[in-house]
């Protein structure tokens, strides 16, 4: 795994349950604000999608974006996480 992807995955691991961030936000957090597409590619190639929650990263326009298990699964995961978060607070 290259250093760029490691940075992306470390940041994504910090996104709290039930919350989302944008690809642009991730790019800024790793100090590469113009690397939005590269962030998307790194997440597309996430070797551990169950552990590294790439489903919590969405497009800047609010659209859900892609996911290895499909957009419907991504939407369901996000909804489930929001519900769990409400129960925990």
Segments predicted by a language model, with ranges:
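Nucleic acid-binding interface residues in structured DNA/RNA-binding domains
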Residues: 1-89
């Amino acid at each position: 795994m290259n250093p760029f992807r490691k940075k992306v995955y470390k940041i994504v691991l910090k996104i709290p349950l039930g919350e989302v961030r944008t690809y642009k936000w991730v790019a800024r957090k790793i100090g590469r604000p113009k690397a939005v597409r590269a962030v998307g590619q790194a997440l597309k190639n996430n070797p551990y999608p169950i552990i590294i929650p790439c489903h919590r990263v969405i497009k800047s326009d609010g659209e859900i974006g892609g996911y290895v298990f499909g957009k419907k699964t991504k939407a369901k995961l996000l909804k489930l996480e929001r519900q769990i978060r409400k129960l925990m607070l």
